[in-house]
Amino acid sequence: MKLQNSRLSHRFNIIWLLLCLLLSSSITIAGEWEQVTTALQDGKANAVRNLSNQERTILQATVALKIDKPDQALMLLASAKHAKDPLVDLLEAEAHRQQAIHAMKQAGGMERQEKLLASADLNDGLGEADARLRAFMDRLNKQEGDPVDILMAGPNVASVFMFDKARNRMFVYEPTRNGGLKQITDEYVVTGTVIGDKQRRGDGRTPHGVYRFVKKLQGKNLESRYGPVAFPIDYPNELDAFHKKDGSGIWLHGYPLDVSRRPPQDTRGCFSLSNDRLLTMARYVKLRHSWVIVGENFVFDHSNRKSKLLSSVKRDIEAWRRDWVSLDTEAYLSHYHRKFRSGKRDLAAWKRYKRRVNANKSFVKVGFTNMTLIHDPNTWPEGEVVVAEFDQSYRSSNYADKERKRVYLARANADQSWKILLEESLKQ
């Protein structure tokens, strides 16, 4: 009997704990919506002042629908109907759906019809409203700080475009003269119809990684469905090719000329902005000097995480350079990853090549300048990856040259040193 009572008491405690957790979660969510509603109504927060009247109304109506107040949503949307906005029409349809469900519940005896209405899925169309609301809430509770992944922007970096697929947001930054970063924009962007990292041609996914804009398409070179202008990126890059990812034609482009709204996942793998915003942002694109970072849930902070990461990368690059000029070939080769490739050479071929070359030298001098360091926000099979690009000056007892170089450094965890996974010389 005591054992049975103990078990019953234990079950009761678990049920009570679950109820408390559910109650506390619902209170937190209710408080969150109340904060958003208040901010949108009083208009004092910077996140609200930067909104157009139309966007503000759409956000207010979206919140009203989230808290099951369709009548309030319809009142708000009535003031936005003049703009002929398809997103307003979709929100209005959702409000009428909620109203109909409420009416059937009050009438009673219509469970089957109520279930049919409840199962009607408007999420594809309303995805843009949800994404915009999430972005607004992020800005309302803004986490201060720079993006961790832009470790160091060299003097030849014009801008960095960051595409956060999880948030459907595009952040754009410009380097400042004092080595900092200035945020140019934070806005809604459309990505591929299929969730996840691109692997194959035609899979509908947007690739994860670090890229550059390399071309500009417009006029007769661009179909009208892509908007007024498009900027292809250099996908697939060396890291993609190393992992046998294929496909091509990943662009930043606009909307079809007769479209003003698009759901969050609605392209064949590209990034898409509304045409007016695309034209505004086009002035910040400088081919081969505008970097592109694609990932999910970027981290922004003022903590020492970024400085620690930067220090570790700079330390290991300098150790590589130092061992190179020492002509201690084995120490120099210890900085290369076991999966290393450069062109057609794997690590074994690279070792044979470098041992042969260094055997005929009495001195080597190497310098790195104009360096850019970008941390890839995505985890690769080799672990964490950083892309380093720099001008390399090389002089030895029998050879000298200068070239632009890009290396991909990898480490399995934070306790390990960075190793060179890929090394390539770039065309000037």
Predicted segments — roles?
Residues I15-S25:
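Bacterial N-terminal signal peptides
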Residues E32-A129:
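Alpha-helical protein-protein interaction scaffolds
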Residues A95, K215-E318:
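Exported/periplasmic cell-wall-interacting domains
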Residues D138-I250, P256, S260:
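Gly/Pro-biased beta-strand-loop elements
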Residues L309-D328, H335:
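Short, aromatic-enriched amphipathic alpha-helices that serve as compact interaction elements
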Residues L333-R345:
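Short, solvent-exposed secondary-structure junction/capping segments
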Residues R355-R406:
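Surface-exposed, charged secondary-structure patches
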Residues Y399-Q428:
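Short beta-strand edge/turn micro-motifs at domain boundaries
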